[in-house]
Design a protein with these regions (language model features):
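C-terminal catalytic histidine-bearing segment of alpha/beta-hydrolase fold enzymes
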Residues: 231-234, 238-288
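Conserved alpha/beta-hydrolase "acid-adjacent" motif
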Residues: 223-229
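N-terminal cap/lid segment of alpha/beta-hydrolase-fold proteins
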Residues: 2-46
């Protein structure tokens, strides 16, 4: 087991500490717009440098996965739950590509010396987690950043899949649920996806993430991001020999995993623990 996590508190309250666990507003400026969210950290009894999780919401962001965020905080993680630009009070315009840029920015933000020192972050233990369209956000961000320790995809949604199949209707139906978002309309979001049609195709991410620690959750009753949506990518990952931790977890749930929350939280924590229990690989494949 990792020395940085206390899995026994995954579903149990922590004892009192001189400096209790707490939270604050997340406020950063990305692309000239203020992005808001929540930042939470564990109690002071966690003495070692802490793992950090950036948890990205989907489209339009109703499902926040707060239960997962609180559970990961209890076992020792610093957790950021941002609202993407144009979503839920954050400034700016909502676009799929902006969500990817937000995730990249936040990863670099938590790696800054000021953030690391203030929240006692282990820079070698940063994870990206994303649900639905947030799965695309973190998957594409993982291709762009250096030193990411692991990636968790929760029913990841490939925004290019239906367009590449020349079947725009299901995507348009999903986008119509985003009336709460500040955007230039469905047409603008669609055009943004079309501009990144080849960039964001899930299976094309393979060369960039094939040796990354990854845990992917699919829901067998999911009609929004069915398991087949990630299958081309996962088939390539399965055929590739790697020393990293790569797990596919199939749950008997619909898109929000509403009847499998305990299992989802437990398996996510076990994945983080398995990754952190291993030495951090260096650029040449050796271990620290």
């Amino acid at each position: 087991m990792s020395e940085q996590l206390s899995l026994e508190y995954l579903f149990k309250d922590r004892p009192p500490a001189a400096t209790p666990a707490d939270y604050d507003m997340l406020c950063v400026k990305v692309g000239g717009a203020e992005l808001y969210g929540e930042l939470m950290w564990p109690d002071g009894n966690y003495k070692k440098d802490r793992p950090c999780v950036i948890l990205c919401h989907g489209y339009p962001g109703v499902a926040r996965n707060d239960d997962l965020a609180f559970a990961l905080r209890r076992i020792g993680c610093v957790v950021l739950t941002p609202h993407h630009r144009g979503a839920w009070g954050s400034q700016g315009t909502y676009l799929i590509s902006n969500c990817v840029e937000d995730a990249v920015y936040l990863y670099n933000y938590v790696q800054s010396s000021s953030f690391r020192e203030k929240y006692h972050i282990d820079p070698c233990a940063v994870f990206l987690i994303g649900h639905s369209m947030g799965g695309n956000s973190v998957l594409q961000a993982a291709r762009k950043v250096k030193g990411l320790r692991g990636l968790v995809l929760l029913a990841p949604y490939d925004p290019t899949r239906f367009l590449r199949d020349r079947n725009e209707a299901p995507l348009r139906t999903l986008l119509e649920t985003g009336f709460i978002l500040h955007s230039d309309g469905i047409g603008a979001i669609l055009e943004d996806i079309k501009r990144h049609l080849e960039d964001y195709a899930f299976e094309d991410a393979y060369p960039d993430i094939k040796d990354l620690n990854i845990c992917c959750f699919t829901a067998t009753l999911d009609t929004i991001a069915p398991p087949w949506m990630v299958k081309p990518l996962w088939s390539r990952l399965t055929a590739h020999k790697t020393e990293t931790v790569q797990r596919l977890v199939e749950l008997p749930s619909a898109h929000g995993f509403c009847n499998s929350r305990i299992t989802l939280i437990r398996e996510t924590a076990l994945f983080l623990d398995a990754v952190l229990s291993r030495p951090m690989p260096t650029a040449d494949g050796a271990s620290l």
